[in-house]
């Protein structure tokens, strides 16, 4: 991924030393400050100055941004009027606002909330300066927001022919151009500069977004932790300033055919620059010089350019069946190449390089992945698996995308050492479990024995999988400082839940470990934001025998009201509705506990939900209907079991049992 966007910018480091081409700006009709001509600085970046706002203007726009952030308008019409008045004030100042730390947030809010015609007007105001804006810290974010909303409008105009009717802007000018044309004009402007954009810490983000739009891929959210576009620091900062995406983000949009043509044109131009004038196509691979290939390989391990190349390799199949960019990086020969072998080895040992290789083998054709695996990785899979921060991620990708025989070969190498590998890489172990399941529980018995040997070894009196897997003693469990659960605790909990799903032995081991804990400790887990999921995960009525179910229920029933009123415990109480199937005494015991403190339960948001899920109103007023629900539940969960007998647990009737008689139900007095 690219470097996080920070305040103190390091001097731009160019891998190849080539100066990025630039676009001549169009005249900008403003009475305030005319931007200087875009020129290349000493490091190849555009050196554009758009001017600064005076104190009065800055104060006005700061206040406008605060007003939009608070969003206390009485109705939508009032908000529209306010936005229109602010846009009127931004006339001829759009470039200044976009490059300002404070006012760029205002521009984003206007773009997100403005009308379609206002959006087009802002788009037109940036004409001639898109490359310069893309290379600036704050305006690059403005462009990303503008392009996402623009992509949504392109789809609307494409699907609704009447949607692109001309509309009047505030200054009386008609906007006749559809958004598709505005996009194509902008793309023509930045095409000569794409070589510089892929290596630029800010412009690379804009270029990646444009590739996603042109290829009709999902446009990522700017705040999601797994967003494919923004850096980690950028996503955190966006959450802190409370700048939320609208409904246009995290979607895939239909685009016109002209966008696919333009995508080919842009990437073909980039390919020529990277190869010294060679065209796309397999017939031209022989004309690529070794020097060009080495320079592109250097970009693959560059923190900024690497994600761009990953995305290009992902989408190049749309317009190029020969996968020219792939063959610009990797050879197509069936014989080993010393330079390629050294390059692959570097990728497998470098954090950026391993991330690149992990992603590209997930997108490319299976035969290309198989070639790299068989030539450079097959004979040392175990060694690569022990590289926790690099090679192990590539092996995980291989387990997902290789053919069955190759996956089984990898498992044969790794499983005997699984108890050692899991010490430092639980995510890798989850991938091994998934691969085993996908291929018919391959080596399941050996995997289970290896993991039991690690987490629940025989011969130890105090063995407990909760301690060996979750590290309870060193966790945030029971802390009085209201510490948030850590990421490590989440990873360990998810791993244990995966083991529970994988084999019944892990389920039984986990239940035994839970019952071995002091009662207070077990209840603390029920109130923990992460460990409560583990407790909830063992409540699988069809996989747990009655004796263990009763032992667990004896603990839960001691604090059922507080559990019902807790954000995490209430989910556990919901699960107990099914977990008490065939155990009507425990079901009534839980319902009676909630009914006995109904005021507390009903006054809690979570308690009300638990009350509803347990049908407590029927329990209090229509017990016959409530018991009918119990019988229906049992019939659904255990269709082959003996029907529930009044006054006792369901089960097989034993010889010598006395007949039971139905007693009249007690009616609650009004």
Curated annotation (Swiss-Prot):
This is Nucleolar protein 9. Residues 1-46, 637-670 are annotated as: Disordered. It is found in: Nucleus, Nucleolus. One of its GO terms (molecular function) is RNA binding. Keywords: Nucleus, Repeat, Ribosome biogenesis, rRNA processing. Residues 28-46 have a biased composition (Polar residues). Pumilio repeats lie at residues 89-124, 125-160, 189-225, 289-331, 339-374, 376-412, 517-554, 555-592. RNA-binding nucleolar protein required for pre-rRNA processing. Involved in production of 18S rRNA and assembly of small ribosomal subunit. PANTHER family: NUCLEOLAR PROTEIN 9 (PTHR13102:SF0).
């Amino acid at each position: 991924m690219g470097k996080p966007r920070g305040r103190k910018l390091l001097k731009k480091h160019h891998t190849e030393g080539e100066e990025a081409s630039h676009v001549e700006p169009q005249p900008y009709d403003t009475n305030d400050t005319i931007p200087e001509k875009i020129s290349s600085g000493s490091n190849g970046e555009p050196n554009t100055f758009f001017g600064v706002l005076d104190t009065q203007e800055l104060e006005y726009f700061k206040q406008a941004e605060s007003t939009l952030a608070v969003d206390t308008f009485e109705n939508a019409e009032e908000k529209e009027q306010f936005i229109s008045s602010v846009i009127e004030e931004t006339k001829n100042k759009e470039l200044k606002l976009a490059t300002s730390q404070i006012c760029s947030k205002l521009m984003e809010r206007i773009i997100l909330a403005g009308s379609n015609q206002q959006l087009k007007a802002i788009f037109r105001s940036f004409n001639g300066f898109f490359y310069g804006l893309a290379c600036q810290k704050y305006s690059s974010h403005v462009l990303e927001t503008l392009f996402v909303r623009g992509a949504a409008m392109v789809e609307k105009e494409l699907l609704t022919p009447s949607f692109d009717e001309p509309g009047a802007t505030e200054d009386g000018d008609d906007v006749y151009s559809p958004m598709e044309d505005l996009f194509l004009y902008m793309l023509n402007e930045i095409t000569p500069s794409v070589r510089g954009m892929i290596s630029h810490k800010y412009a690379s983000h804009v270029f990646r977004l444009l590739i996603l739009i042109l290829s009709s891929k999902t446009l990522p959210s700017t705040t999601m932790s797994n967003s494919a576009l923004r850096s980690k620091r950028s996503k955190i900062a966006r959450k802190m300033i409370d700048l939320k995406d609208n409904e246009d983000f995290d979607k895939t949009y239909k685009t016109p055919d002209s966008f696919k043509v333009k995508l080919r044109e842009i990437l073909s131009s980039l390919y020529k620059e990277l190869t010294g004038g060679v065209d796309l196509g397999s017939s031209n691979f022989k004309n690529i010089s070794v020097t060009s290939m080495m320079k592109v390989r250097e970009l693959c391990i560059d923190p900024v350019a690497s994600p761009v190349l990953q995305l290009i390799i992902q989408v190049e199949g749309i317009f190029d069946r020969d996968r020219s960019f792939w063959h610009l990086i990797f050879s197509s020969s069936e014989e080993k190449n010393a330079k390629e072998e050294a390059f692959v080895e570097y990728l497998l040992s470098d954090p950026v390089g391993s991330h690149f290789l992990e992603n590209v083998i997930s997108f490319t054709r299976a035969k290309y992945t198989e070639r790299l695996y068989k030539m450079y990785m097959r004979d040392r899979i175990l060694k690569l698996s022990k590289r926790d921060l690099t090679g192990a991620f590539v092996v995980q990708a291989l387990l997902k995308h290789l053919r069955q025989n190759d996956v089984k070969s990898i498992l044969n190498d790794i499983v005997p050492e699984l108890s050692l590998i899991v010490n430092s890489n639980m995510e890798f172990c989850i991938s091994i479990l998934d691969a085993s399941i996908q291929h018919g529980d391959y080596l399941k018995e050996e995997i289970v024995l290896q993991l039991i040997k690690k987490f629940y070894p025989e011969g130890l009196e105090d063995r407990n999988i909760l301690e060996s897997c979750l590290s309870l003693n060193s966790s945030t469990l029971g802390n009085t400082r209201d510490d948030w659960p850590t990421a490590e605790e989440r990873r360990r909990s998810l791993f244990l839940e995966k083991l529970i799903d994988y084999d019944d032995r892990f389920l039984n081991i986990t239940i035994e470990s839970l019952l071995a804990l002091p009662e207070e400790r077990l209840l603390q887990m029920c109130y923990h934001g992460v460990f409560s999921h583990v407790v909830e995960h063992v409540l699988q009525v069809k996989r747990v025998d009655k004796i263990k179910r009763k032992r667990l229920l004896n603990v839960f029933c001691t604090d059922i009201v507080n559990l019902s009123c807790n954000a995490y415990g209430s989910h556990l109480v919901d699960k107990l509705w099914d977990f008490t199937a065939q155990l009507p005494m425990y079901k009534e015991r839980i319902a009676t506990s909630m009914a006995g403190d109904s005021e507390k339960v009903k006054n809690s948001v979570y308690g009300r939900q638990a009350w509803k899920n347990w049908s407590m109103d029927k329990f209090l007023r229509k017990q016959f209907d409530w018991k009918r629900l119990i019988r229906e539940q049992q019939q659904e969960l255990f269709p082959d079991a003996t029907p529930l007998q009044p006054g006792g647990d369901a089960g097989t009737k034993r010889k010598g049992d006395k007949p039971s008689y139905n007693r009249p139900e007690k009616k609650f007095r009004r």
